Amino acid sequence: MIELMVVVAVIAILAMIAAPSFKDFMQVQRLKGVNAQLVTDMQFARSEAVSRSSKLWVNFGANLSMTCYTLYTVVETTTPNNKFGSTVRCDCLAGPGAACTGKLGATEVRTVQLAASSAVKVKPAVAGSYFAFDPVTGGIFFPPSDLEGPPPTKFAINALIDAQRTFRTTIELTGRPSVCGDNSPGLGVPVC
């Protein structure tokens, strides 16, 4: 009986030691999965823009309970306010199937939401929450801006758990995504 209690105590101690690292392992695997889905969605958006012969917009959002992004098209008009389709923004916080509700001329293609409880977030790396894929070139498109300076040449998106466990997906001007990460072991991508 004493031997059994010693074995149970040893197993309990080993479980307490292994549980935190197992939780960390699960979070990193979830991060890898979310980033893989993000890259796939960006490639899908690029090909959809070309196949639909229409800009395909990508818009990001966040609140306390989630981060999200939505892919959508907008019927471009000749009115000055919507010449490039840039004044209509679907809201991924509304949820899949409802992100473009009430947005004139907008058609939702895909919406992804990540609950804050999952510990993984997806958000733009810098200011700005949207861009489009051009249907002619397959490259990225930014609507004209009145701000001074050269136009952006890429759009970077972070998929992260924390500052030490982050993937950065960069959509280059050509529309192709590339992925790098921080120096954390186990991420398996080049260091940014």
List each language-model region with its residue ranges.
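N-terminal helix-rich module
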Residues: 17-31, 36, 47, 55, ...
